[in-house]
A protein has these predicted regions:
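Amphipathic alpha-helical segments that mediate coupling or scaffolding at interfaces
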Residues: 9, 27, 61, 73, ...
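Acceptor/aglycone-binding surface of glycosyltransferases and processive sugar-polymer synthases
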Residues: 67-75, 79-89, 96, 108-185, ...
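Structured catalytic core of nucleotide-sugar glycosyltransferases
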Residues: 1-135
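Short conserved micro-motifs on helix faces and helix-strand junctions that flank
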Residues: 9, 73-75, 165, 238, ...
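Hydrophobic helical membrane-anchoring modules
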Residues: 184-313
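Conserved amphipathic alpha-helical interaction elements at protein-protein interfaces in regulatory
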Residues: 26, 30, 60, 64, ...
Length: 313
């Protein structure tokens, strides 16, 4: 039997936590009874600086529930950092750790399959959605676009995989060697290597509360993923500059020919359009460069990714 830790990041999840803890306790007990997990297995609730009663609930669960552990971050650091904090806290206590969301959308009934594949020798097991029926048309379309862009840019990500995954202790040790401040675990974990496999599941509707990933956060998360793992946007800027330079030379030749043949067109329409076009392209390129420079600025400061305020083992 193996010691299995379930790592659950929480941010303002007071509406779902009681039901989440109830279901996780029942599932973990069944895993222990079936021999997939031992009595030292736990589910670790990580409070990412919540503003509601999330931590108050977690402390109560830890007093009453032998399988519950809690970790509180000193302030809100985002889902990825909260998840990393939980995984690294579980690293020396568990044979493997499985990360999942607190909103009960990840199907916990497939946890058995994760552990079975771990016992078969896999160090990383990815949870992959069978379909995206619970998402809106807009979210489905943007998600597909995101994964396609990532693959075009050469980033190794698993299609339709979020953060529902199992990692062995060896994989967690490898993960601890990555010190990026700008975290994108979906891109980092495949870089670890080791033997991996997939578990396919159906994602449920959110049990209660609201999504903690509105459109603004999703766009920011996608941009972080792109700029953290690929320099192709910078190369595209260079290629775009070469293309525009070539077009400018052709335009200049056309203008000179028109001037000397007496066919010059009066008016400023073409000039104004060119100025607006080139100005827009320049601003876009500056924005891309600024995004990369901002990441460099964050990384070189080497500030802590999170700070643990309290840990309830």
């Amino acid at each position: 039997m193996s010691t299995v830790y379930l790592v659950i990041p929480c941010y303002n999840e007071e509406a779902v936590l009681p039901e989440t803890v109830k279901r996780l306790t029942d599932k973990l007990q069944r895993m222990i009874d079936s021999g997939r997990a031992d009595e030292n297995s736990r589910f670790l609730l990580v409070d990412d600086g919540s503003k509601d009663k999330t931590w108050e609930l977690i402390t109560g669960f830890c007093r009453e529930n032998v399988y519950c552990s809690g970790l509180k971050l000193a302030h809100n650091r985002g889902h990825q950092n909260a998840l990393l904090a939980g995984l690294l806290a579980a690293k020396d206590k568990a044979d493997c750790a499985i990360s999942l969301d607190a909103d009960l959308q990840d199907d916990i009934e497939v946890l058995d399959q994760f552990v079975d594949k771990f016992h078969e020798g896999c160090d990383v097991v990815y949870g992959v959605r069978n379909k995206r029926d619970t998402d809106s048309f807009f979210k489905r379309s943007t998600a597909r676009g995101f994964y396609k862009v990532m693959h075009i840019l050469g980033v190794d990500v698993v299609y339709d995989h979020a953060d529902y995954r199992l990692m062995s202790r060896r994989a967690l040790d490898a993960l601890s060697e990555y010190h990026e401040v700008n975290l994108f675990l979906r891109g980092i974990v495949p870089l670890i290597g080791y033997r991996s496999d997939y578990v396919f599941y159906d994602r449920h509707e959110r049990f209660a509360g609201e999504s903690k990933y509105p459109l603004k956060k999703m766009i920011s998360f996608a941009l972080d993923g792109i700029t953290s793992f690929s320099v192709k946007p910078l190369k595209l800027i260079s290629n775009l500059g070469i293309l525009i330079s070539c077009l400018s030379v052709l335009g200049l030749l056309y203008a000179l020919i028109s001037y000397f043949t007496g066919n010059a067109v009066a008016g400023w329409t073409a000039i104004v359009c060119s100025i607006w076009l080139l100005g827009g392209i320049q601003l876009l390129c500056i924005g891309v460069l600024g995004g990369y420079i901002g990441k460099i600025y964050s990384e070189v400061k080497a500030r802590p990714r999170y700070r643990i305020e309290e840990f309830l083992p």
